[in-house]
Amino acid sequence: MMEPYILQDFGGRFLTGEPAHAEGKIWPGISGYVEWFVPAASRPVSVLFVHGGGGQGSEFLRTPDGRPGWAHSFLRAGFPVYILDRPGHGRCAWNEPVHGPALPLPDYGFLYPRFVEPERHDLWPEAAKHDRWPDDPRAGDRFMASQGPMATTLAASQHHVEAIADALFELIGPTIIVSHSAGGPCGWALAAKGGDKVEAIVAIEPLGYPGMVHPLGTFENDLCAAPYAGAADPFDRPVAIVTGEATWMREANARAAAFVRDRGNVFEHIRLEEHGIGGNGHMLMSEINSAAIADLLVAWIERSLGGRASLPSSDAILG
C-alpha cells in the first residue's frame, strides 16, 4: 500500500474562450478542463499531464484495475499536479460545429491488438514481449469505456490546445509537461505557447517524427503536423522521450529522439528495458509496473532540473 500524503488544495476549472457562432447558433468556444491537486509541501514547479488520442485526463488518476495512477506518484513526490482534458475530450464534450469533424469511436477490434493484448497478435516484431497489462478481466473494458472521439487531423487537435494555452498557463504557472501518444504533438505546441513557463517535457511514446506520413496528417513542422502558434522553441528545455519494450512506437520514437538530440538540447531517450522495466506496451500509465515507471520519471526530472524542482521538506509531504 502506498504511503498517504496531505493535500493543501484541489479543484478544477473549465478553460473557456469566446463563444463560437456556427450554424446560426451561439455555442461555447473551444474549451478545456484542468483538474489540480496540490500537496502540503510542494515543489516550485508542477506537472501537467496531457492525455493522448481519444483518451482523457482520468487515465492519470487510476489504472484500469483500480490502482493509484501517476498523479498519486507525483503528488507523493511533492509535485503539484494538473490534469488536462483537452478540448473535445473528457469533461469537454465534442461539438462538431465548434471542434470540426471527429473520427468514429474506435472499437475493440482496433484498440485491443494495439493497446491491451498485442502479444496475441503479430502486428509488429516486439508485440510478443508484451506482458504488463493488468490481469483484471474487466480492465480492458474500462479502458475502452474511457475512449472518446478525436479530431480527423492532428493539426486540428494541435489548434484546439493552442486555443486554451494562454488560460492554462495563467492558471498553473511553471510546469513540466508529461504528454502521451497523440497528445505528444499537443505537448510540443503547448511548450511553444508557454515559453519559459515550461521547465521540461516528458513525452511518453509521442506520436510522430519529422516527415512522418500519418493518416491524420504529415509531420511537416518538426514533431507536429502544423506550424506552432507560439514563438518559443519547444525543444529549448530538458526533454525526455519514453518508450516501452513491446510497443509499435519504438522506431518512430527513435527517429523523434534523433531529431531532438541533434538540436543540441538536454535530452534523454528513456528505453524502459534499459532500466530494468520490461514488457510494456503503449499505455505505460495503466500497466502493472506503472508506479515503477513514475518513479523513473521523477528521478529524471530531479536530475534534469536540479534546484529548480527541489523538494522543500520531505517530512511534510507524507501524512
What do the predicted segments below correspond to?
Residues 134, 148, 155-176:
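Conserved acidic catalytic loop of the alpha/beta-hydrolase fold
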Residues 178-187:
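Gly/Ala-rich beta-loop-alpha elbow adjacent to hydrolase catalytic centers
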Residues 1-42:
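N-terminal cap/lid segment of alpha/beta-hydrolase-fold proteins
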Residues 177-178, 201:
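Conserved alpha/beta-hydrolase fold motif
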Residues 41-129:
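Short, surface-exposed "cap/lid" segments of acyl-processing enzymes
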Residues 277-279, 283-319:
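Catalytic active-site module of serine/aspartate enzymes centered on a nucleophile-bearing elbow/loop
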Residues 206-271:
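The feature captures the conserved acid-bearing segment of alpha/beta-hydrolase catalytic domains
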Residues 49-55, 181, 206, 244-245:
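Glycine-rich His-Gly loop
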